[in-house]
Amino acid sequence: MSLKGSLKLPAAPKDKVRNITKFPVLVEGEVVTNYAQKDVRPIFQKLSYPVFIDLSEGIYLLEKLNLSSNSLIEVTSLGHLNKLKRLILNRNNLIEYSVQGLSSLVYLGLCNNRIDRITDMSDCKKLINIDLSGNRLTCGDGFDHFSKLKSLKVLDLSSNSINCSLIDFQKKILEPLKKSKTLEYLSFENNLIEKKYEEFRLFVINELPKLKYLNWVLISKDERTKASKLDSEGFFSKQLSILSVTPVVHNNNNPNNTVTSAQSSPSLSSVSTPIPTPLNTSSNNIGGGGSGTTTSVSVGSSPTIRGMPSSPNSRSTSFIQRKPSVGANMMPKLNSSLNRSTDFLGKERENHQSTSPSSSSLSISSSSQNNNSNHHHHHPKSIDETPEVLSPFDILQSKVNAENCLSSSQQDLIVNHNNLTTASQILQEIKPTKELTKQETEDYIDILLNELQPNNTDFPTFASVIDQKVYLDLLYRAIIEDAIPEELIEECNKSTTTAATAAAVVDFVTPQLTSLSSSSSSSSTTPPQPQLPPPPPQQQQLDLSLPLPPVNIINMPMDDDELISVPTDESELPVVSTIVPSLVKESSRESLLVTTIDNSTLSTTPPLSSTTPPSPSPKLPTLEETIESVVTAKPSSTTTTATQTNKVSGGSAKEIWTKIDQNTATTPSTPSKNLPKRLPSQSNLINNNNNNNVINVPPPTQSILKPVVGGGSGSTPSSPQMKPMAKPIAKIPAVSTTTNTTPTSTPGSPSKPIMKPVIKKVPAISLKQDQPPIVSPPQPQPQPPIVQQKQQQQQQQQQQQQPQQHFKSEIDKALADIDSWGVIPTAPQAEIKKPIIPQELLSNIQKVESPTEMVENATSKLDEMIMEYHNTSPTSSPTNTRKSITPVQQQQPIQQPIQQPIQQPIQQPIQQPIQQQQQPPIQQIDQVQRMINNETNRIGSMMILGQNISLPNWIVPHDQIQVGSRLGLGSFGDCYTGNAFSIPTILKKLRTQRFTDQFLGQFKNEVMQIRELQHENLVPVSGCCLDNNIYIVHPYYDASNLQTLLFEQSHNNNNNNNNNNNNNNNNNNNNNNNNNHTIISNEFIHRVSLGISKAMTYLHSHDVVHRALKLNNILIDRVSGNVLVRDYGFNFVKDGIFRTGQQSSPYLAPELFNSNCNQYDTNSDQFGFAMILLQLFTRSPLFQDIHVSRITDTILNGVRPEIPDNVPSVFSRLIKACWSADSSARPSFLTISKILSQPFQRIFALSPSTTITKPIVSTGNTTIDSSSSSSGSGSSSVVGSVNSTTIPPVNNSNTGSTGSTSATVKHQFSETGELNRKMILVLERIVSMLSTAAASASTSTISTDSIDSIKRALKALENLSSPENHSSMVGIGLMRSLCFIGTIHLAEIDEQLLRVIYSLSTNEQLSNEFILAGGFTPLSQWVSSSSSSSTSANISLLAIKLLTVLADEQHLHHVRLTGILSSLTQQFVNYTSNNQNGGGGSGGGVINETIILQSVGAMSRILLNQDNQNQFIEEGGVSSLLKMLLNSGNSLSMRALLALCCLISNQNCKSQLHNAGIIPKLMELLSSPQKLLRLHSLKVIETMSKDIEFRKLLIQDNCLSLLVNLLLNSYNGTNTGIGNNTTGNNNDSQESICSILSCIGSLLKNQIALESFYQSNGVDVLIKLIGYNQQIEILESLFPVYCLLINHEQSRLKLVPTINQLVEILSNSTLKESIIISILKCLTLFSSHSSCIEFIEQSMSVSIVSTLLIRNENNYEIKIHSLRFVSSLAKVNNKLAVNIHMMGILQTLVNNLYDKNSMIKDEAISTISWLVSSQECRSIFLQKNVLPMLFDFLSTRNVDIMERLIWAISFFALDDSAQSLMRDNQQCIQFIVNCLDRHEEVFKTLSIKTILILSQKQINHQALKRVGVDFQLQVLSSSSNRSIQLASKKILSLLS
């Protein structure tokens, strides 16, 4: 947001204003000419945004300034940098920038910002290159500034928003560019206008004949000829004339484009794009993919909202963005009521579909031809119909239809009660809950809500008679229990109803509640019978002769499945149901994903049979799933095509309250196109046993969910045939020639839905006992593409033609079977429910003797056969067998010969291991490895680094490697795309260059070991390439790393475009959804963490340490969603890089830094794993407030990132254990994998320690402790679950009195999930009431009933509109309904409506919804209401308050376009004119004054927009504000001052403000006795001082003198306040002093101001403010002014005595870091002047600084400024070197030579160079071996450091011992001689001096001659510098 002209920071407190910051200076007092991006990085990492930079000091003579990538929003007031040549501001968030005064500017970089207009560049006469690419430039004003640039050659306008008509483009852009005669390079690339017009490039070439390059492509002669030809033929003029007659209509600029098209063309439905959520993704898969778009009036939208424009995302995010409710099952006492449905949309939707079946199809837009063809074969009657795409409302409606459906025989029993109008009629006919029809319930609740009378018509926004949470609870109970609670009736009686009426209602309701409770208790023992839900709309016209009972779908967790298969007869296959979306009841947003039932392509209609439950017997309590019966089918002998579907409509009156979590399915005919693949865990069909013994209790500690796989014809109810499922073989892939595996799921589908566990008693008997037959429908076989179908058909024909193949040996036959594994077509495999295994049997699972040994024997035999085959085959290689033993094939069934022993019945159950995640595409990996082997065997041998050796099969020749583009950086190499043998691969190029024989041998050994590691969660190593560069070859993966998924939001935003552009291709649409839309959900976190732990467990089991485990090394496959770990192994390379570069990574364990990578083990990887886990939850960088160079020290000091409270307990404790400083205390990855393999619900439960203390409920005179209350049934707690917390009832039903809830109860209630659940229900009811009333108002005159309904809905919203409830109101269409009601403008509800909108608009998301719904349109009418009545004035006042809230910068143009700005300006003009004429009524005057106050306050925000400023100035608003500034009312003057502050920088009114004498008026306000006026005037002066012209005017008007007087008065007030102990006065004076000092600091940037300030005795006042006990806030504002005055000589002489005070303040150990740094800066400035050295020496400042260096060893800022002070002292006067030595600073300097921070290292070198001039310090440095340390830095390229080094060496040369060290170090001598070649005189002088000293001794001559010093000296002997010439000749004579 641009804050131009405003001191107020957005979303900050009122007293929060801009903080001025300065760049650090290497040496204080020296001129700075260049600031690179790395130089300014520390200041941006330290301070919080926004950062405001002051570069106006004289020391900043910048020629280059690079502020890229710092999120800056405004760069202005750079005019004083008149020597600046290069200004680089790329990759920021700039909206405002100013280059005025930059007369030397040559290059201006502004790419990738948010600039939408060009500012004045008239001062930049030398500007050559401008980069404005990647901004938001349109065809607006500002391009004429280019015409003033006489030197412009390069202009880049690519990737902007230029999309205007060709005439405007020519007039506003090309015409100014024509005036720039030097323009040669121009780019309009990636602008919409470029592709909008024909021959656009030729048009620009014709308009700009001097242009050489357009879009960075050379303009050829042919293009110029063609452009001239088109111009001569009149082509361009014709285009311009056509455009001038027919203007271009930009549909993208019309926010209501969809609605407009829908209104203009009734036959076309307006298409709205759903927001990409898991719901949209799931709905696209339903019905074979479906269309990617929805309609504006679709089946999923609420049928009650008619006549309102449909918004694309009205409800699409309401379920997804809502925070998960962690306490969905926290109240066991409400289980009976919570199990009932609370949705009110189902019946109306059902009636709507049944009464007008054709309307549904008309409201759905036509789909693509692909979808039509998919349904053509099986649905001849609905060829033109398309399956609808489900929005979140559709999903909710499907849930209601699935739960409340009725059979056809029960449909006749429905009675509609549409004429019920009063509550008394409903109460007279009230029935128990189970007997109410849906329509009766909805009508009753509607009237019940309408009759809840408010307590007060003027109900406040955030207050109510009843607490809002209690009110919501009562309202929720009224809806759930079909009765009005007594408390709510009592409150209603207080407002409108009489006591007699209330008593009658209570007397009638009480028996009804009794009947309801009895009905509820009886329903707990007899579960409701599921009914068949209605078919989808497109299938309602079909009919099926035989209705099918429903089939229940239970999604079982993959890791908990145990499959025990049964022999299946392939001739008998059951019928499969079609897709029915259903919701899984769970307390997270992932639970709202739609689950579906896949279809098989079977076309038979067999008779049905149902399974029977087993006879009751003693059972053990075992956790089981609540399921429905499964239908079995017997196929008929003939095959027919199902063409009809049973018509089902209506619902049973007894089945209204069907449980939400029961999933049912319909059985319409099957579509011809198969659905996308789904995980096996999503398609298990479970049989339902008797549910009579089902009891709802909290779940036990461990859940055992065990489905069973299918039965065939041989299975009977008394004797089921089962076979054991052996443990998957490790080395042999499972293959079956007769069966097929269950198709896997597409990525992104939910693999572990949450299921409601119940206790079911299972007989503790052996498995020999007879079991009932369990048959489940098979899963559909995915239909392959056409090419694959043809290939499979050909293979099947070949197999039929050759049924028997003759093999020469058993080995050939086995290998033939292996080769045919991937192509053999298989049939679907049925799965049935597995019998429950008692817990005690599981303990003996290791003792079971199963046929698994036989499988292992067969496997080993097959291994021997394969080895024998390879031994006899000369052309095969060991890698060729890797495909057959890859673990990815383990999930396939074992080959038939091996499968025979398994089919025998077993005596004991065999536990199946946890299923692994989906494997990576290993076929591509094997292809790479196979090609490497084959090609290397073909080549045989080659030259590798000059050695003729035999080439192993895993080494790729360098001529077979093609290196592509670079992907990124790794821990020890760079990754590139490429090809190996023309196969896409990933190539990692090693960053090391040490290609010794030892290194190559170690590397090849590592490759041979690493390539043997094969795991599903590892990126394998296929081979390597040894050439001049070393490459590691990996298979190519289409994957994203975890760093990108967590921190780059653009990865998630691409899904919208993919859905819009790929509606005609279902497969592409699904792939794009999966590739570009990754939700960081709990499911995702669990999958990633478990995948990493499994991979690391495998690596550690092979003694491989990763040592670089971080986000970038974790890949997520875009196709399969599999988790892959890369960059493992090769630790000898990583250690070498670490030791040389000293990497500082937050993922490295402390022992890696302590031991310098010499001692670490596998436990080091757990540290990086902990950091990854933390970032999965926080989605933020680690140690983001700490400089990267200090991360290592931070970790070594035991500091770790903070773990948020929302991290589950399991993960929180796991993170803390993994990042323990003691590596032996960290858990192994095997333990971690076991922890993460627990049930999903358990590991994501909150910590038991976070449970809330048992609340105390006060009911009348009795106090009840909830811990001893017997009302809750869930007394048994569950470890790790929040279900152990019991919420007591609100009132005591025994006493019948209303309970007063304590604060503890309300706090607990707000933290549970019940509040969210009830809030959703009530808000849906409120939105329905508002929408119904709005729809009736749009069609006819609104009735009184509708107005009353709106009033009651608004009243409920007022009670619920607290900030904590705002999140539940986002995305439900509430603000759109309120906006639509506002357009009606009903006088009865406008004031109440405004109050509600104002309270809700305090939430940013809700305010944006209101604006997007067109909220400024009704707001403009409310603002302009000018009636004299008090009601109208109140409405206008509320509207202006609402405008103040909505006036955000991105929406300010709406204020101008809707006429609000003009209305407010006219109010100002009228107000000021009436006051001058003495007008204004007595009664309305006060109201008008209040309205004007609010209007002026809102104007201070509206005028932040430049266009708004211009219109306000044109309409005469400035003069009105100036008149208000002189108003006697302080409030109005203050607000007018703030509004004028926004206009100060506007060029159109700058002269007007100056001529109006605003500065003298400000001076008058500064003298005002009102403190508030003075403070605001100071802020305005501070803002004005940033403008050079106003700054001069303020100084001329003696503003500084006035400020000094104010400062003195405030200082005296502070002293008076302290003496009298008046804290309030003291605080007021402190605030005034800080504001005055800020203004003075802004004005003192001018040298003239320094003299004026000195003459005003301002320095004397500042000296009074300096003291040891001075307040920190005053000191922070004082020292910036203090530093400015040190550069003024006269002021410095007065300030020098205060050095002792500065040092005294510095000695305070509790001083803030910012104050310490400021004082060090001041002392450094003093030390640069020799006149101040004496005071510094007397102040003992060196001793204090020495203490600071020791105390703040780990503080980067204090350390660097302390070293600068010491360096400055040593530079000016070496007499202080003795003091520096005595204080022990020399050792600190030596220690800092190898500091990790380069700036500290450089400063230490600089300080040492100044100190070596002292003989005593030089001797100490030689003793500490400092000179050889300096030799290590001789290769630096830093010119300043090179100068310091040659300076130090020239003094070290004076000592004989140092000469010996120099003589023995040839690099040192070479460095000295090389300095003779530099053009800087200082280098030549110091080098000549050093050589002259060394040449004095004969022993040094040989070393000097060895580096060629003779030649250099002969050149310098003819130098123009007389001194250098004489010295060179003298040295030559000595050397000769």
UniProtKB/Swiss-Prot annotation:
Positions of the UniProt region annotated as Disordered: 253-319, 347-386, 516-544, 599-620, 660-689, 702-756, 769-809, 1050-1075, 1261-1308
User: Which organism does this record belong to?
Assistant: Dictyostelium discoideum (Social amoeba)
| Comment block on domains | The protein kinase domain is predicted to be catalytically inactive.
Residue stretches of each LRR repeat = 61-82, 83-103, 104-125, 126-147, 151-173
Tell me which residues bind ATP: 967-975, 988
Q: Where is the composition biased (Pro residues)?
A: 527-538, 774-785
Q: Which residues form the LRRCT domain?
A: 191-230
Which Gene Ontology cellular-component terms appear in the entry?
A: cytoplasm
MF-aspect GO terms: ATP binding; protein kinase activity
UniProt keyword list: ATP-binding, Leucine-rich repeat, Nucleotide-binding, Repeat
Where do Polar residues bias regions lie? 310-319, 660-673
**Designated name of the protein:** Probable inactive serine/threonine-protein kinase DDB_G0278909
Domain Protein kinase, by residue range, is 961-1241
One record GO biological process: signal transduction
Record Gene3D superfamilies: Leucine-rich Repeat Variant, Phosphorylase Kinase, domain 1, Ribonuclease Inhibitor, Transferase(Phosphotransferase) domain 1
